[in-house]
C-alpha cells in the first residue's frame, strides 16, 4: 500500500505494533514498500492493528514535519486475487481507446482481457463473471461483427442475443453457470446547460430476458416485457433461487426523467427451466422510501443487498449525490453505511467471493474520473475504504482514465486475444 507526500524531498515511515517498530522505510516523494516485505508483514499481523507514523521534509518544512499517526487493521480474510474493470477516458460520447483490464491484487500487474483494438475501435462493455470464475465469463463488443462473447471452460463463442431488434445489455450469471439474466435496454442521454449534472442517461425502454447457454434460447416473461414498467440490472441470489432487479413505471422521457424512481423487486427462479415464478416481492419501494435504486448485488451469504442510491434515474455514476445503501434481507431494514460513502458519486460495486470485501467505483477524488475503492465488511458494517493501490500513488491522479464496472475474479483470465479479435471481426 504505497503512499506519498507531494513535493517531499525525503519521507520516512515507521510501522509499529504495541509500541514496537515492525518496519522502517524511506523514500523521496513516495514510499515504495517491497512486495515481499509487505506480504510478510501482513501475514505476521493478521487480525491486528499497525500504527503508521510518517515524517516528511519539504520546501515548506525543511527541518521536517511529523504527521499525526494513523492505524491500519490487517484483515484475517483474504481478498480475491484479481479485479476486472473497464478502462475508458472520461467523457460522454466519443473515445478512441478503451479496454477491459484485469489487475493482480497481490502485485501491480495490469493486463488486458480485451481492448477495442480487437474490435476495430468499437465499444466493449458489460463484462460479467460466473461466481468470479476466470474460466466462465461474458462481455459485449459493439461494432461490425460484434456480439456477446461467452467463454465457458476455455471455449469461446460469439452470440447475437437480442429481442425486438435490441441487444441484451446488463448481465448477471446464474451461479450454476447455465443461465445468464439480461436486461435489454434502449439507452439514451440528454445534455443540460443549466444544471449541476450536465448529463442524464436514461432508458427509453428496458425488459428482462433469460439466456440459456446450453440451448442458445432466449426465455421471455410477458410480465417483464410490457410497456408499463421498465426493468433493469438483474442479479441472482447466491443460491440461484431468486432473481432481483430494478423496476420503474414508464414515463415520457427525457421530459419526466426526474420522476424516474426504480424499486428493487425479487422473483423466484426455476433452476431447471430458467423460468421466473411467483410471487413478485418488493424489497425496496422507491415511491415510499424515496430515491431510485440501481445495481443490486447480494452478498455471498445471502444476508445483505448492496445497491447504488440516487435521487432519481438509472445511471448513478452521473449523479453526484449517489451513494451505496445496504439492506438486511432478513429484516428488510435499510442502512446508509456512512463509512463507505463520501462526497461524489459512488456507484457500481461487487462482492468478493467470501463476502468480506467490496470493490466499488467512485468519483470522490475530483468528481470527473472514476476510481476504484475497496472496503472490508464485518458484522454488517463497512470499514474505511482505500483506493486501488498503485506502485506510484500519483498514477491514480495522473492516469486520465476512468475505472468502471469493477468485478472480483478468483484468478487470472487467460484469453486468446488473437482468437477473440478474429471472432469479433468475422460476420459469423
Residue ranges of each PLM-predicted region?
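Sequence signature of WD/YWTD-type beta-propeller architectures
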Residues: 1-428
Amino acid at each position: 500500500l504505497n503512499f506519498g507526500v507531494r513535493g517531499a524531498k525525503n519521507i520516512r515511515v515507521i510501522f509499529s505494533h504495541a509500541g514496537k517498530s515492525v518496519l522502517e522505510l524511506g523514500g523521496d516523494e513516495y514510499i515504495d514498500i517491497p512486495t515481499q516485505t509487505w506480504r510478510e508483514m501482513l501475514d505476521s499481523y493478521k487480525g491486528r492493528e499497525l500504527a503508521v507514523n510518517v515524517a516528511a521534509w519539504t520546501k515548506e518544512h525543511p527541518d521536517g514535519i511529523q504527521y499525526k499517526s494513523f492505524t491500519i487493521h490487517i484483515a484475517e480474510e483474504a481478498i480475491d486475487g484479481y479485479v476486472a474493470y473497464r478502462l475508458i477516458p472520461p467523457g460522454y460520447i466519443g473515445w478512441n481507446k478503451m479496454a477491459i483490464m484485469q489487475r493482480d491484487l497481490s502485485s501491480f500487474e495490469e493486463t488486458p482481457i480485451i481492448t477495442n483494438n480487437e474490435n476495430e475501435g468499437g465499444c466493449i462493455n458489460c463484462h460479467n463473471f460466473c461466481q468470479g470464475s476466470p474460466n466462465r465469463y461474458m462481455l459485449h463488443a459493439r461494432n461490425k461483427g460484434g456480439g456477446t462473447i461467452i467463454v465457458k471452460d476455455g471455449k469461446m463463442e460469439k452470440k447475437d442475443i437480442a429481442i425486438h431488434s435490441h441487444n441484451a445489455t446488463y448481465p448477471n450469471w446464474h451461479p450454476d453457470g447455465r443461465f445468464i439474466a439480461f436486461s435489454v435496454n434502449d439507452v439514451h442521454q440528454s445534455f443540460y446547460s443549466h444544471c449541476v449534472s450536465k448529463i442524464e442517461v436514461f432508458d427509453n425502454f428496458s425488459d428482462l430476458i433469460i439466456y440459456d447457454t446450453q440451448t442458445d434460447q432466449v426465455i421471455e416473461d410477458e410480465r417483464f416485457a410490457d410497456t408499463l414498467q421498465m426493468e433493469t440490472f438483474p442479479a441472482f441470489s447466491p443460491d440461484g433461487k431468486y432473481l432481483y432487479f430494478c423496476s420503474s413505471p414508464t414515463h415520457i422521457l427525457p421530459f419526466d426523467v426526474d420522476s424516474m424512481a426504480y424499486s428493487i423487486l425479487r422473483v423466484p427462479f426455476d433452476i431447471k427451466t430458467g423460468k421466473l415464478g411467483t410471487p413478485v416481492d418488493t424489497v425496496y419501494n422507491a415511491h415510499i422510501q424515496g430515491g431510485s435504486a440501481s445495481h443490486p448485488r447480494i452478498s455471498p451469504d445471502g444476508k445483505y443487498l448492496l445497491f447504488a442510491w440516487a435521487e432519481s434515474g438509472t445511471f448513478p455514476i452521473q449523479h453526484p449525490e449517489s451513494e451505496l445503501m445496504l439492506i438486511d434481507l432478513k429484516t428488510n431494514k435499510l442502512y446508509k453505511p456512512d463509512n463507505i460513502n463520501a462526497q461524489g458519486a459512488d456507484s457500481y460495486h461487487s462482492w468478493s467471493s467470501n463476502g468480506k470485501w467490496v470493490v466499488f467505483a467512485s468519483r470522490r477524488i475530483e468528481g470527473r474520473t472514476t476510481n476504484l475503492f475497496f472496503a472490508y465488511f464485518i458484522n454488517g458494517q463497512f470499514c474505511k475504504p482505500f483506493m486501488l493501490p498503485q506502485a506510484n500513488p500519483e498514477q491514480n491522479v495522473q492516469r486520465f482514465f476512468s475505472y468502471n464496472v469493477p468485478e472480483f475474479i478468483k484468478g487470472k483470465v487467460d484469453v486468446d486475444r488473437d482468437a477473440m479479435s478474429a471472432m469479433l471481426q468475422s460476420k459469423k
